From Swiss-Prot:
It is found in: Cytoplasm. It comes from the Bacteria. Belongs to the thioester dehydratase family. FabZ subfamily. Gene3D superfamilies: Hotdog Thioesterase. The active site is at residue 56. This is 3-hydroxyacyl-[acyl-carrier-protein] dehydratase FabZ. GO terms for cellular component: cytoplasm; membrane. Involved in unsaturated fatty acids biosynthesis. Catalyzes the dehydration of short chain beta-hydroxyacyl-ACPs and long chain saturated and unsaturated beta-hydroxyacyl-ACPs. It is an enzyme of class 4 (lyase).
Amino acid sequence: MESPIRIETVDINTILKTLPHRYPFLLIDRVVNIRQDYSGIGIKNVSFNEPAFLGHFPERPVFPGVLMIEGMAQTAGVIGIMSVEGTEKPRAVYFLTIDKCKFRKPVLPGDTIEYHMKSIGRRKSMWWFHGDAKVNGVVVAEADVGAMLTD
C-alpha cells in the first residue's frame, strides 16, 4: 500500500523559491505526489532547445546522463525541503554522493523524464534517496543520491 500524499504538486514557481538553481541548470519542471514516506516524482520535459544538445551530440542529440542524475538530486532536494516540518525550513541543498548509478537507455528531445525518488535513509541534516528515471514507464537511469539540507 502506498503512503498517503502530503503535497499533490510543487509547481515551477515554488521550485524557484525552494532551490537555488536557475537556467540553464534547473533541471526539473515540477514535482508531484510527495508522500509521507518522503517519496515523490520530479518531471522534466526535454526540449531540443536544451543547451546540452549544442554539443551532446549535434548530429544525434542525447540528453546527458549526468544531467539526469542532477535532476534526481534536485527532485530529492525538493522532497526533503518540502517535507521538513515547522518554520525553520532549510535554505540550501548540497549534493553529497552518487552511488549505484546506471544509464539504461538514451533520452531524446521530446521525451518527458519522471524522476521517481524515495528516501532510503536520513541522519540529522543528511538524506539519502534511491531514484529511477523513467520515460514512458521504462527505466532509463537509476542511482542512489545523498544530500545535505542546511541554512
